[in-house]
Amino acid sequence: MPLHHLTRFPRLELIGAPTPLEYLPRLSDYPGREIYIKRDDVTPIAMGGNKLRKLEFLVADALREGADTLITAGAIQSNHVRQTAAVAAKLGLHCVALLENPIGTTAENYLTNGNRLLLDLFNTQIEMCDVLTDPDAQLQTLATRIEAQGFRPYVIPVGGSSALGAMGYVESALEIAQQCEEVVGLSSVVVASGSAGTHAGLAVGLEHLMPDVELIGVTVSRSVAEQKPKVIALQQAIAGQLALTATADIHLWDDYFAPGYGVPNDAGMEAVKLLASLEGVLLDPVYTGKAMAGLIDGISQKRFNDDGPILFIHTGGAPALFAYHPHV
């Protein structure tokens, strides 16, 4: 098996079973194309989400190192920070979160509801900064301060997007390949591409398991020119650690994230409402709504390689709906 080196990396079991892969019949009728969804929004801790896959590897490494504190960073409404804090609470670890307000809002819901509310419930230590200009360096500075207070910190990068964290989505590719055995002629997989770990892990895994399937990353914060080097760097780092080659091109669409990261747009919100009304599935305004807008528009614009079924990776994020009210 080409991915057998995955077993070399310690993994903390947090998810327990493959997440569902479901056909969306009513949504499929809308653009006239078979659409499936991988439900990583229903992972079992703290309202779900994709970051749990990365945390299985990252937190296993933290425990191996004897850490008693997890430190990470993100936006006030970060799904990654929420899931990291929840795992810390579950394991009896301290969690410190370095947060920014990337959209510069004073809206009370954004500042106090949604993911931010959950951080308080998980007893997270919050540290605010004006902007995450160099998050890796800022996290190291914070870790030094926390260590001086007597803690044993472990730094988890923004989005959990290191080569180690991204192993969670190489693992996910194994699940997808097994679950898609009954999906005839799967053409494409669509995923939101942000901190790049989910995208890069899937790129490595699917290249070796489903080489004929096109993987599209819909950017949520950067242009193709800015995002592609980030995905490629992680893709190559992952492949190196797994003793694999990674030659698949990285496909990105950057037409759907404007006006910027964390700012809802009309197409994304229409996609959120469409999935809710047709399938009872909740997307979010920051990641999956914009990615689904790209999928739907990509069908209408004939941007996919062929007319076969499409799989959408639902990375979660529904708690942010409450933070973005009344835009929802």
From Swiss-Prot:
GO biological process, one term: D-amino acid metabolic process
Keywords, ordered alphabetically: Lyase, Pyridoxal phosphate
Protein name in UniProt: D-cysteine desulfhydrase
Gene label: dcyD
Catalysed conversion reaction: D-cysteine + H2O = hydrogen sulfide + pyruvate + NH4(+) + H(+)
Subunit structure: Homodimer.
Cofactors, names only: pyridoxal 5'-phosphate
Function statement: Catalyzes the alpha,beta-elimination reaction of D-cysteine and of several D-cysteine derivatives. It could be a defense mechanism against D-cysteine.
Highest classification ranks of the organism: Bacteria, Pseudomonadati, Pseudomonadota, Gammaproteobacteria, Enterobacterales
EC annotation from Swiss-Prot or TrEMBL: 4.4.1.15
